[in-house]
């Protein structure tokens, strides 16, 4: 499914980099590709307008079904929600609502 929201291209890349930097400062050691995967899967499934808790649960289950794992931190709902919370901050700075993203 083609992504048609406002958060795409260079802005999506900038968001991913910014979120990665914020998580690094919080002590998370994870690759930027993992953040990109969260953003891409969130939009692929069309769930970005749901609550952060619901998105995190859906993505945790989706990644489990796909056999996707992360180390040293588990790719669980708590980590996914942390990514989504920083994404929300970025969206706020960019003046984009989650529904428009």
Label every model-predicted segment.
Residues 1-23, 99-100:
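Hydrophobic membrane-targeting and insertion signals
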């Amino acid at each position: 499914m083609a992504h048609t929201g406002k958060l795409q291209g260079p802005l999506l890349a900038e968001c991913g980099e910014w979120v990665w930097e914020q998580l690094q400062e919080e002590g998370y050691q994870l690759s930027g590709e993992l953040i990109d995967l969260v953003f891409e899967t969130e939009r692929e499934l069309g769930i970005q307008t749901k609550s952060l808790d619901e998105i995190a649960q859906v993505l945790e289950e989706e990644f489990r079904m796909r056999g996707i794992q992360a180390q040293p931190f588990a790719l669980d709902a708590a980590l996914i929600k942390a990514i989504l919370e920083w994404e929300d901050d970025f969206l706020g700075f960019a003046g984009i609502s989650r529904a428009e993203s």
